[in-house]
């Protein structure tokens, strides 16, 4: 009996020694359309961004290495450690089985918490695993994950495929909602939050600081009510600040409206760090801050100061190119759709009219290249035949998912603004530094203050978090850990 006891204790000790050290909580904070230079353009108060800059590890040269640089692809790439070519989220919208769908559209589900008859949403279009998924696999599904954002895709994609919940803002019902993919009824704490904050939620949350405040307030309630960071396994809380993007699209970078949201964001981060310190402890949580993409200054802002800029409006480009193709082939609508700097050929029209596909493709690319603002219109399937820089070819390839992405990718000249000249708002989506250079800061558990200017990538975020936690990288991950 004594010998058996000794053996059992030895096995227990061995298992304990093999158990890796992990934080109680991982907090992912993504600020939609936050340019890297915003870190240094604002006069931050105490406790928020200033704490991150002073106590965190900064990666000052973090790049998105694919196109298009848009919200859904960015959130998916951060949490999967890979790009649209592998995770399948080819844009905010893309073609799926011949239909234009949103990145998280799922007609097999329905909405919960607002108008329950609304179209459902889920992460099913995301075909690779995430940080949260890998945490659950590593802990036999004891880890818990929650996603919070105003935008549906910004809450759903980061939370992975098996979270406790994902909650986003529904304008129609002026409430935070979810879908039947996760549950059939809102948790009491979310319903109570909607009731308590009804007036604020019903306000212009997209363009006012209150949208940021509500996002963090709901995240704090998730932290408390789901007891995140209080269990035996590491949990994940994914927060995305969406109104920084929405307001910038309408009013432009560094507009007073956008500035006011960033000032409020600074205060909310300060408060949330205090909450985390009190509930979890600074040494028990790992936090990272990044962005899903950057943003291009508008045509009016650039030209007002004599800086080079131009505009190109994709809906007009679709109409103009189709007119050229109709004259050449005698068939209307040979280009079916455009989205995220890509154009889709109308395969049905080409086939039914017995047209030569390659001839239509060549003509379409030529038609789309006619405006001087466009440098290349690329047949992605034959991209290696184009005389464009290798680095740009690789970004196009890494953003292309066959069947979902458009067959033609548009490369505007550097500095070209996607929109109309009179629009004051910002935009994004291209390979340029303004759109692809993003902030990246790690702080908390096992992170020493410091910074680097070496090249890092958006895909390195998931690789770094998983490596620090000693869990398997997401199954499509192509990133490299930042820390040795």
Label each PLM-derived region with a short phrase.
Residues 23-35, 52, 78, 135, ...:
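Beta-strand elements within well-structured catalytic alpha/beta cores of enzymes
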